Structure formats: structure tokens, C-alpha cells
């Protein structure tokens, strides 16, 4: 289950991992946009030479790829499993004070939370790893009950085990003496001033914890001087929450499976 890069002679590549019976592609191939679907086709034809491989999953790939793959005569592309929209927030326009009537409910929830709880933010290395793993486990348990699609917790556990290697920041939210969530992210490669909020995980132990974690992350990113925030992909429910902060939808992605005809 260790992710690997598959590379072509022209330096195109894709990030994948596999089990005994399936492969999974994570996000778009690193290639020219017009070559992305072709790279997935080539990879699919190669892995299906192994008769033990029954399915190839394409996870969160650009919405332009699916229609192109549907034309392949040797591969059967199944219906889209789910689609995500990816909002980007202009941090210059974001005001941490959350002024105006639009943010009244958020301000009230924030004020109530900090009146009722003692909270602090600490670096990840100040908290035992087993406690961070426990946050992820509880997040997964709740998430599986709330949504139909699969919940992938591997990347969170791996990040913890590897001391958040590659992340610019990883901060743990401690409430009333207990670690209850964490935020982590890094700068977007080749995009100066742009930050990716990759991880925001909580254990659902306190009312409004998700909101408060979001506000902590937004404040940190704002204070660090970043111009843009990639808020990460979401479906309708999570997207509705993010749109309160007036981001722009920059792209859409699909997740679907491919089998050999």
C-alpha cells in the first residue's frame, strides 16, 4: 500500500498504489493536459496484463479526462462514483474579524466556543503520535457513518508516522487539555504565495469543533502572508460550508473505476 510514481520516457508520471486485485491512480497524471487521458489508458492497458488485477480506480482526476476515456474500445469506464469541486480563497480579501451580518452566526459560534473551553494550538511534535492516530480513527468512524463513499485514512496515518515530512506546518488543536484535531498543509509547488490546506481532521468530540479548526487554519494562513488558499475538494455538503467564505471554484474532479472489456 506504499504509493509509487510511474514514469514515462518523456517524464510524464502518475502517483499510484495497488493491492492484490486493484490499482488506484491519485489525481491527474503529471503531463501535458492533452496527454492525461492517454497516460491513464496506457497505464490501464499495462496493469490489466496481470489477470489478478480486476479494477483500476482513478481518484480525483480532472473532469476533462472522463469523457475522453469513455471512447476507449478496450477498457470499460464505469459511471462516475463521485465528483468534487475545488474552491480557492483569496486571502487578501479574507478578514479574520469576520465583519458584517453575513458572518454573524460564525462570530457567535466562535465566541461561545472560547467562552466555554480553554484552547491552545501546539506543534505536532508536542503531542504523542498515538493521540494523533486516535483523532484520525475517530474521524474515520464518524465519517463512515455520515457518508456513502469510502473514507481513506491512510494518508493521515502515514503523515503522522513520518512526522509530517514535506509539510510546512502541522498544528494540533488542544481543548481542555485534550488533543481533538489538527491542521496541516504546505506551499503549492511552482505557485508563489499559494498554500494548500491539505489536512483538517477532528474527532467530533465538541460542538462546532469543525468550524473552529477552519478558523484557526484561515488565521494561520492569513498571518503567514499567503495570497491564495487551496481549500481542497468537496461534495455539496462540505462545499456549502466553504462557500460561506466566498472562494472561487477553480476546478472540478471525478472519481471512477475502469475494468478491462
Enumerate the language-model features and the residues they cover.
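Short, conserved active-site entrance elements at the starts or edges of catalytic domains
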Residues: 127-179
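Short, surface-exposed connector motifs at secondary-structure boundaries
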Residues: 49-52, 118, 220-227
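Active-site/acyl-donor-binding loops of N-acyltransferases
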Residues: 77-98, 223-261
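Short, polar loop motifs at secondary-structure junctions
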Residues: 60-65, 233-237
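Conserved donor-binding loop and adjoining core beta-sheet/short helix segment
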Residues: 1-64, 175-204, 250
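Acyltransferase donor/substrate-recognition loop-hinge adjacent to the catalytic core
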Residues: 74-145
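Short catalytic-loop micro-motif centered on adjacent basic/acidic residues
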Residues: 55-57, 122, 227-231
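Glycine/small-residue-rich hydrophobic helix-like segments
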Residues: 161-227
